[in-house]
C-alpha cells in the first residue's frame, strides 16, 4: 500500500489528496478487465472500436454537467476554475480541438469510422447510466459532491488515457505519430483534476460535514467510472 495511505492507520487524518489516493487504491481500477485485455493484447480490434464508439457519447456529454456545476459554485473566483475547464473542453474556441471532435478523429484513424457512423450508433444503457449519474449529481446534489466526483474522474482519466493510448499504439491500431486525443488528455486532465480540487480544498478543511460530502463524491466518481469500463468490456460484442 502507498505509504501515504498508512497515515490513517497511525491515527493521522488524511488530507484531500491522500483521501483521493485511498479511494482509488480501494477501487483498484488498474485491474479493470478493459485495461488488462488491452495491455495483454487480448482485445479484438473491432470490439475495442465498438466500445470506443460508445465512449464517444461520454466524451460529448461530459462538459454539460460541468456547465451545470459551474453555476452552483458560490464565488466567482472558484467558479472560474470550472469555467476555465469548461472552455478547454470546447477547444478554447477552436472547433477542431473540441474534445468530441478530436475523439471522432481518433475513431476515424483507428477504425475508419466516420462521424456519421458514430452519430448513428445507439447509446448503450451503460453509457446512459454514466451520463445520467453525472448530470443528476451535478444538478441535485451539494456542489461539493459534484466537484469531487468530476475531479476524481478527471484524475482517473489522465492515467487511463495513458493506458489506452499506449495500448492502441502497442496493438498497432494507430501509429504513435498519428495518436490524437488520449495523448493530450494524459497531461491535460492532471490540470483539470487540480482545478476541481482547488474549488473544494478550503471546504475540506472547514468541517467534518464537508469532508463527508467530498468523500461521497470521490467514492461515487471512482466507482462510477470504473464500472463504466467494466460494463463496456462486458458488452464489447454488442453492436448498438
Give residue spans per PLM region:
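Non-heme di-metal
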Residues: 2-240
Amino acid at each position: 500500500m502507498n505509504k501515504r495511505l498508512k497515515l490513517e492507520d497511525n491515527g493521522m487524518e488524511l488530507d484531500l489528496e491522500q483521501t483521493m489516493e485511498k479511494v482509488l487504491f480501494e477501487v483498484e481500477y488498474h485491474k479493470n478487465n478493459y485495461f488488462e485485455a488491452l495491455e495483454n493484447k487480448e482485445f479484438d480490434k473491432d470490439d475495442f472500436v465498438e466500445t470506443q464508439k460508445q465512449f464517444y457519447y461520454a466524451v460529448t456529454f461530459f462538459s454539460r454537467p460541468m456547465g451545470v456545476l459551474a453555476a452552483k459554485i458560490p464565488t466567482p473566483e472558484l467558479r472560474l476554475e470550472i469555467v476555465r475547464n469548461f472552455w478547454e473542453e470546447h477547444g478554447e474556441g477552436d472547433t477542431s480541438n473540441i474534445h468530441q471532435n478530436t475523439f471522432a478523429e481518433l475513431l476515424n484513424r483507428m477504425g475508419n469510422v466516420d462521424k456519421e457512423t458514430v452519430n448513428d450508433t445507439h447509446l448503450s444503457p451503460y453509457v446512459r447510466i454514466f451520463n445520467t449519474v453525472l448530470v443528476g449529481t451535478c444538478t441535485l446534489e451539494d456542489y461539493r459532491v459534484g466537484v469531487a466526483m468530476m475531479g476524481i474522474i478527471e484524475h482517473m482519466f489522465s492515467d487511463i488515457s495513458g493506458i489506452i493510448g499506449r495500448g492502441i499504439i502497442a496493438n498497432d491500431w494507430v501509429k504513435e505519430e498519428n495518436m490524437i486525443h488520449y495523448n493530450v488528455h494524459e497531461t491535460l486532465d492532471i490540470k483539470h483534476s487540480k482545478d476541481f480540487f482547488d474549488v473544494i480544498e478550503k471546504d475540506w478543511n472547514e468541517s467534518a460535514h464537508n469532508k463527508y460530502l467530498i468523500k461521497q463524491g470521490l467514492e461515487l466518481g471512482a466507482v462510477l467510472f470504473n464500472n463504466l469500463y467494466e460494463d463496456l468490456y462486458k458488452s464489447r460484442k454488442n453492436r448498438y
